[in-house]
């Protein structure tokens, strides 16, 4: 079968390739190269199917298998491997598409040695892919597809309690094991005549903090307003230590834990206190309730865009002013936190009753 490089084809060359595919001249590699050439020259898969009888899924399979075959050639495989796959085996090579060149070559050889079909080589390829993804190569197992399957069987056999299933996995592992170390580990499983594997420890309950909000921030609690300036100033500044935000607590200090919201994280020296919401300037309409005020003592520069905790005659209060505040500023109001809304506590506490 005449081959064409994937450049711009003349109409005569195009018809010649279509005729060769329609008559299925040559072997699968020639078909794959013809399909690739025609597709790269603007023919769509459906039109190619109508002209040749090669379904789109078959076009894709043999084209991908051809690319796998070409990559295997770069690994200089034995002559019988090259020659065999020139004749047949596109379905086997297609299953190796997600492996690297080295593993493709080894799997292709293993498929011929073990006379594996497409379903079996798919399982081998998956085991090989999983094995190569392990952060550390398991001890006593080589980087070979056979040992990858053996490792999979060895691991699963230790988890099975059914003797029949365990025996099947051991037999399969011994069939594929390539290295002496892998074979020895699997043979050791045969010594356990009870068929009940020793119990392994459970998985560790490991979690990882993904965002700043996952890590709460502890704020020293000052009390309920109004407070004197001396009470505000007496609270020691808090500095969280380490990746988990450890806090050393002075004796007798009360604390309030809040989510790691950005407004709180950016505050340099925040403290928390309580106040009735109706006592705040520009308070929203509605029933009164106690709210948490977070105040940053490190920010004492007046700004008309913010509210401040200001020292007054009756004690510190939240204040806003369009012009500079003459009274001592004790800190900037960072946020106001309302309690969780409970719609009807009495209804929640009362069991529901239904009429028959």
Curated annotation (Swiss-Prot):
Region (N-terminal alpha-helix): 9-192
Gene Ontology annotations of biological process type: carbon fixation; photosynthesis; ribulose bisphosphate carboxylase complex assembly
Keyword line: Carbon dioxide fixation, Chaperone, Cytoplasm, Photosynthesis
Subunit structure: Homodimer. Forms an RbcL(8)-Raf1(8) complex. Forms complexes of many stoichiometries with RbcL with and without RbcS. RbcX and Raf1 can bind simultaneously to RbcL.
Function: A major RuBisCO chaperone. Acts after GroEL-GroES chaperonin to fold and/or assemble the large subunit of RuBisCO (ccbL, rbcL). Cooperates with RbcX in RbcL folding, plays the major role in assembly of dimers into RbcL(8)-Raf1(8) intermediate complexes. RbcS replaces Raf1, leading to holoenzyme formation.
Family statement drawn from the similarity comment of this UniProt entry: Belongs to the RAF family.
Protein name from the UniProt record: RuBisCO accumulation factor 1
Organism encoding this protein: Synechococcus elongatus (strain ATCC 33912 / PCC 7942 / FACHB-805) (Anacystis nidulans R2)
